[in-house]
Amino acid sequence: MRRTPAAERLSELGFPPRRGRQEPPFPLGVTRGWGGWPIEKRREGPRPVPFSERSPEDGREQPAHGSGILWRVRTRLSLCRDPEPPPPPPPLCLLRVSLLCALRAGGRGSRWGEDGAGLLLLPPAGASGSLKAERSSSTPYAGRMLENSGCKALKEGVLEKRSDGLLQLWKKKCCILTEEGLLLIPPKQLQQQQQQQQPGQGTAEPSQPSGPTVASLEPPVKLKELHFSNMKTVDCVERKGKYMYFTVVMTEGKEIDFRCPQDQGWNAEITLQMVQYKNRQAILAVKSTRQKQQHLVQQQPPQTQQIQPQPQPQIQPQPQPQIQPQPQPQPQPQPQPQPQPQPQQLHSYPHPHPHPYSHPHQHPHPHPHPHPHPHPHPYQLQHAHQPLHSQPQGHRLLRSTSNSA
């Protein structure tokens, strides 16, 4: 059985027969591109010439080239000259492409993803004017806020602070530098305040006395203040690319990383204001100590006048107790050794026993240590107790011993 070819089967199904290779028109009949410029299909080989541009000589030579030129001419969708360059694309296309590039860079998690997006997506001319208006509208609120607190804004701008989280992302903060510290405000809160301020300002412009009502409508701001009294140093200043990185070290030991464009020089301004604040505090401390010393000197003269009369009455009674102990030594000689001669008189009498050296002083004055020499014993006791009357008593003792002998 002979197999029918594919062309016959297609013709049986109702499809038209294929007449050589034919190219369809450029995609789905689209004749103009995104920016409005015409699409020109280019093929390899000699460029076909449209009928309107052909000369009679070209027409005579057409049969020599063959019938392929006809369908080539049919595929050309635009009748434009090649030497003319295509018109430049509008900026809208570039903006869309830049948006896609920025989203891709940020999605990959690159370090500079957010910066690239900020650089590529430039706002149009009208938007820049609106941003300036928003910035100018934000400054009065910051000024009023600082005036209420009694501070003066020395510098305002945007600083990027490294977050304390695990990812350590750079977050933009609206910073206000004052004479006493650095104020950090989240940008979202400022945007909300600006949005609430703008309708309030529109109603407040015709009538000036409604100013306090607008101030009362402003929501409270969540501020973070880095006071110079708690600030130790500004350290680790590094320049990488277009940014300057620096670290603020607090007295508690906490370190806060910041970065800013090199042209702004936030690190120099912060260090200068911190040094000036510390100098002012030192001068105030010296003045306060001097004032305290002056007050003490002024209070000292009345105190000396009160102290002087106090020692005078103390000096007068001092000689009186000195005079009283003078009669005391007079009664001291009163305890004279009057009872002592009584035992001596007892010793003066002769003992009835023939032995005169047998312990004559046991009863009145017992001696713990025995004397080796018995003869001088009575004389030593007599000299110790009563040296003035020892001689006559001694003679009596000698006489008594002689008589007994």
Swiss-Prot record:
This is Pleckstrin homology-like domain family A member 1. Residues 1-11, 54-63 have a biased composition (Basic and acidic residues). Residues 204-213 have a biased composition (Polar residues). The lineage of its organism: Eukaryota, Metazoa, Chordata, Craniata, Vertebrata. Keywords: Apoptosis, Cytoplasm, Cytoplasmic vesicle, Nucleus, Repeat. Widely expressed with very high levels in adult liver and high levels in adult lung. According to PubMed:10428057 expressed at low levels in liver. Expressed at increased levels in atherosclerotic lesions observed in hyperhomocysteinema. Residues 350-376 have a biased composition (Basic residues). Induction: Induced by IGF-I. Residues 309-344 are annotated as: 16 X 2 AA repeats of P-Q. The keyword Iron-sulfur does not apply. Its main location: cytoplasm. SUPFAM superfamilies: PH domain-like (SSF50729). GO terms for biological process: apoptotic process; positive regulation of apoptotic process. It is found in: Cytoplasm; Cytoplasmic vesicle; Nucleus, Nucleolus. Residues 189-202, 294-309, 378-389 have a biased composition (Low complexity). Residues 153-277 form the PH domain. Residues 310-342 have a biased composition (Pro residues). It comes from the Eukaryota. One of its GO terms (cellular component) is nucleolus. Residues 1-67, 189-217, 293-405 are annotated as: Disordered. The keyword Cytoplasm applies. Seems to be involved in regulation of apoptosis. May be involved in detachment-mediated programmed cell death. May mediate apoptosis during neuronal development. May be involved in regulation of anti-apoptotic effects of IGF1. Required for TCR-induced apoptosis and expression of TNFRSF6/FAS in a T-cell hybridoma cell line. May be involved in translational regulation.
